């Protein structure tokens, strides 16, 4: 290895802290062990290299084989001499270190040569179909390795929707961000046969942070390297939020890819934890029960499924309050999970972010987001089971299309998740209503004929910590 090559290698090595270097060295020694021991038997001082077979053997359980092959091709694409664009036969330690350095600590320009070769082993532009296959493999690998390493933080493949559809939906969403050289977005199905050069892919990786984050997860968790060191996983620490409150055999309307995508659009301070407040499967099909479980619980994600199978919802940035006025702020958004995955943010046209009303004769009663009275982007009627998503052509508040299969839909299931930490006003410590603490006070009220106005709209606070 010449001086220039040696200097480049040392520069990449210097990006790693001493304990990280030790981690990377140990991993390469493990991966190259079989080939080096064979060389030692022959009495030859051969340079250690890694083979595809060794990498496959190491990654057999943590990662799908297609992704292992892609990683190996990425490693082989590192040109140590600067003279050849061909893939090497084996992977040398210098290639391995530079590969890890570029993907984990590099910018979009440093990552792009590797990613191009992970997409296709042939040099030059890549087809849309090849990018789609790479993206689907990448998302599938993230779901697989997080499940395998038990890093889904309370979510499981059993308590969420089947991820197969979610993988395709998230892949399509990320691919929709591909921009051609003239700045226009490629449209399916033409996208599949189109060719994209290095500059387009580099721009895509730069603008779509999920690609780098997913590669980081696959490397750290797949190779089991640099995954436990402090400050090295900031980009992926809240990729999946902690899950609280799923009990029994409840299966969420979310799948793992959609949880990852929706969570990435929440304010950063809310991304670390989701807590199930209401599920129609668990708490029954009742609007008063819905209100009782979600009022004054902090920011929430609402998700519902209509009887045609469409899944969609919205993020409420403030605690829900029962009142005949709009509430919330411009951090609110609507989203679709199935048949397509997308997020629709505010337009600035109006401030009709979120609305919750119950028991009034002169104003609409129900839960709504976006649009206007009787013409909401998302509406769940207080006559539980009915709803609408009106958007001709788009919801004025969020620029969302019709989210349900039919404009007026029938509700099949509904969930509400509190996101982030519970607000102090909703915490149980010293905050119980006198009616919860003192049953005699409740009885006295009833004896004197006083009605409990909060009955049905206020959830009795349980003694156990339901946050665990």
UniProtKB/Swiss-Prot annotation:
Transmembrane segments: none annotated. InterPro entries: TLDc_dom. Residues 252-420 form the TLDc domain. Pfam families: TLD. One of its GO terms (cellular component) is nucleus. It is found in: Membrane; Cytoplasm; Lysosome. Its main location: membrane. GO terms for biological process: positive regulation of protein localization to lysosome; regulation of cell migration; regulation of cell population proliferation; response to amino acid; response to insulin; response to nutrient levels; response to oxidative stress; TOR signaling. Activates an alternative mTOR signaling to regulate cell proliferation and migration. This is MTOR-associated protein MEAK7.
């Amino acid at each position: 290895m010449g001086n220039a090559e040696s200097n480049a290698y040392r520069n990449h090595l210097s990006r790693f802290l001493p304990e990280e270097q030790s981690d990377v060295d140990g991993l390469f020694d493990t991966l190259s062990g079989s080939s080096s021991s064979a060389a030692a038997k022959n009495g030859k001082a051969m340079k250690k290299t890694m083979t595809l077979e060794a990498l496959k053997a190491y990654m057999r359980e943590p990662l799908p084989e297609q992704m292992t092959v892609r990683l190996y091709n990425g490693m082989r694409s590192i040109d140590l001499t600067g003279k050849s664009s061909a893939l090497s036969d084996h992977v040398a330690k210098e290639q391995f270190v530079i590969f890890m350095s570029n993907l984990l600590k590099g910018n979009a320009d440093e990552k792009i040569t590797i990613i191009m070769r992970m997409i296709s082993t042939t040099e030059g532009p890549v087809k849309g179909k090849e990018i789609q296959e790479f993206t689907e493999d990448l998302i599938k690998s993230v779901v697989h390795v997080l499940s395998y390493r038990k890093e889904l933080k309370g979510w499981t493949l059993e308590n969420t929707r089947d991820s197969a559809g979610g993988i395709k939906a998230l892949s399509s969403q990320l691919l929709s961000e591909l921009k051609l050289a003239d700045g226009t977005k490629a449209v399916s199905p033409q996208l599949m046969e189109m060719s994209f050069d290095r500059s387009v892919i580099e721009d895509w990786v730069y603008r779509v942070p999920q690609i780098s984050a997913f590669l980081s997860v696959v490397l750290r968790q797949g190779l089991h390297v640099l995954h436990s060191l402090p400050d090295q996983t900031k980009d992926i620490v809240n990729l999946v939020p902690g899950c609280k409150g799923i009990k029994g055999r409840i299966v969420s309307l979310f799948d793992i890819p959609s949880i990852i995508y929706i969570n990435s659009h929440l304010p950063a301070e809310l991304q670390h934890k989701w807590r199930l407040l209401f599920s129609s499967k668990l708490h029954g099909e009742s609007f008063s029960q819905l209100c009782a479980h979600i009022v004054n619980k902090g920011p929430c994600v609402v998700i519902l499924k209509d009887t045609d199978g469409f899944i969609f919802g919205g993020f409420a940035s403030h605690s829900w309050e029962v009142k005949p006025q709009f509430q919330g702020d411009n951090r609110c958004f609507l989203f679709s999970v199935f048949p397509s995955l997308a997020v629709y943010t505010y337009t600035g046209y109006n401030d009709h972010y979120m609305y919750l009303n119950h028991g009034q004769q002169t104003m609409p009663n129900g839960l709504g987001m976006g649009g206007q009275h009787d013409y909401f982007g998302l509406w769940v009627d207080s006559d539980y089971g009915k709803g609408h998503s009106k958007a001709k052509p788009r919801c004025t508040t969020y620029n969302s299309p019709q989210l349900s299969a039919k404009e007026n839909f029938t509700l099949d299931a509904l969930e509400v998740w509190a996101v982030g930490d519970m607000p102090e006003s909703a915490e149980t410590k010293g905050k119980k209503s006198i009616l919860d603490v003192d049953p005699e006070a409740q009885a006295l009220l009833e004896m004197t004929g006083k009605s409990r106005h909060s009955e049905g709209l206020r959830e009795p606070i349980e003694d156990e910590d339901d946050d665990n």
